[in-house]
């Protein structure tokens, strides 16, 4: 399955532009409606979803090189770990080492790349997921990445934001603001919207 996904993303990369925003995730991340959210919210950066149905942190560096490195992203949202819960229970330190190695690898490719580590959703109050999220927060903090905590129950309402954006444009601000949006705001839009819930 992953080989087909990699092949698809390599083909899409022929159309992609560099310096965009990339979601590097797994599971339900493959269904995030990037085009619609980007258009509705006036995000001026190109956005690409390079998520896989299943992806372990163990394979992440190789997959990054095949599918993401060629488009030289300005921002990467890493949302990996769901497939690693069993391995994490057995050995926390290997998970931490491989996650840090991925972040280091991304920075070696582009020193200015903004990186956000996204927590794993856990609706069933699984203590292993809770512990993994604590590790992800520590990794993000120690590696100077932003941390997107999806365990905080805040649902982003894209319709209200779209109405606000429309009002601002109608008041004479025709073009979206060109300054980079705070990563946490984008995390809320992409991973916590009613559309994706």
Language-model features, listed with the residues they occupy:
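A generic secondary-structure signal
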Residues: 11-12, 63-70, 101, 105, ...
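Active-site segments of SGNH/GDSL-like serine hydrolases
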Residues: 79-85, 107-131
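Charged, glycine-enriched surface loops/patches
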Residues: 93-118, 135-145
């Amino acid at each position: 399955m992953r080989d087909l996904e990699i092949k698809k993303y390599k083909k899409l990369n022929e159309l992609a532009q560099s310096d965009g925003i990339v979601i590097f995730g797994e599971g339900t991340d493959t269904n995030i409606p990037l085009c619609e959210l980007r258009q509705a919210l006036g995000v001026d950066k190109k956005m690409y979803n390079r998520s896989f149905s299943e992806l372990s942190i163990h394979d992440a560096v190789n997959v990054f090189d095949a599918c993401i490195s060629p488009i030289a992203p300005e921002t990467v949202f890493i949302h990996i770990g769901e497939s690693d819960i069993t391995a994490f229970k057995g050995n926390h330190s290997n998970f931490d080492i491989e996650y840090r190695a991925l972040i280091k690898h991304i920075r070696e490719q582009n020193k200015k790349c903004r990186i956000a580590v996204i927590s794993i959703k856990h609706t069933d109050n699984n203590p292993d997921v809770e512990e993994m999220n604590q590790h992800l927060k520590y990794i993000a903090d120690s590696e100077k990445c932003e941390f997107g905590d999806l365990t905080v129950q805040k649902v982003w309402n894209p319709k209200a934001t779209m109405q606000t954006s429309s009002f601002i444009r109608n008041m004479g601000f025709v073009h979206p603001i060109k300054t980079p949006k705070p990563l946490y705001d984008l995390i809320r839009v992409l991973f916590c919207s009613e559309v994706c819930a």
